[in-house]
Amino acid sequence: MEEREESISFVDQRFLGSKPLDDTNVLEYFSGSPFYDKSCNNEILKMQTQFRGLDQKSKLFSMVGIFYEVESSNHEKTLFVIRKAYNHGDTAETLGMYYIIHGHVYAAPTNYSIYRCRMGDSMWQLNSFIDRMMEKRRFNPFSPPKGRRLAKSLEDSKDLDFMMEIFNDFKKEQAES
């Protein structure tokens, strides 16, 4: 089973020991990571221009296919954001984002993984609330129903108060932890 990009990281201590990362060599460093596609346009241009000294950046945006570019970096050169994109000719579609923090390369989470994580957290919270409510609730399916409507409406309001009390207790516990 292939490991998901979001769960792995990469660091090359040998590269970092030989020279510090900056805007000129960060893509070279990134090319050694498992996130880098060796068949991208950056590699093709590197082979074609390595002895000619041509500007790769201007050629890169005119080629159709996958390419990588440094999207941004901070002033201290400890954080770099790298964009993986597919150039269709007239437009470029972002395929992924990666970031390098102090030499460690990570894949940025996708919208899907963020939503999935948030939904999982929400479901866990809801399940915890229901479990807590069921611990405090005294329900007997075999008890006979109340005959009068007034008694029923009073019981419903007690149930609502009871549920609100449990919910507020649960919210307080979550805020404290």
UniProtKB/Swiss-Prot annotation:
Cysteines engaged in disulfide bonds, as pairs: none
The entry's keywords: Activator, Nucleus, Transcription, Transcription regulation
Predominant localisation class: nucleus
InterPro entries: Mediator_Med6, Mediator_Med6_sf
Location(s) in or outside the cell: Nucleus
Biological process terms in GO annotation: regulation of transcription by RNA polymerase II
Any one GO CC term of the record: mediator complex
One GO MF term attached to the UniProt entry: transcription coregulator activity
Coiled-coil residue windows: none
Source superkingdom: Eukaryota
Family: Belongs to the Mediator complex subunit 6 family.
Record function comment: Component of the Mediator complex, a coactivator involved in the regulated transcription of nearly all RNA polymerase II-dependent genes. Mediator functions as a bridge to convey information from gene-specific regulatory proteins to the basal RNA polymerase II transcription machinery. Mediator is recruited to promoters by direct interactions with regulatory proteins and serves as a scaffold for the assembly of a functional preinitiation complex with RNA polymerase II and the general transcription factors.
Subunit and interaction comment: Component of the Mediator complex.
Identification of the protein by name: Mediator of RNA polymerase II transcription subunit 6
Gene giving rise to this polypeptide: MED6
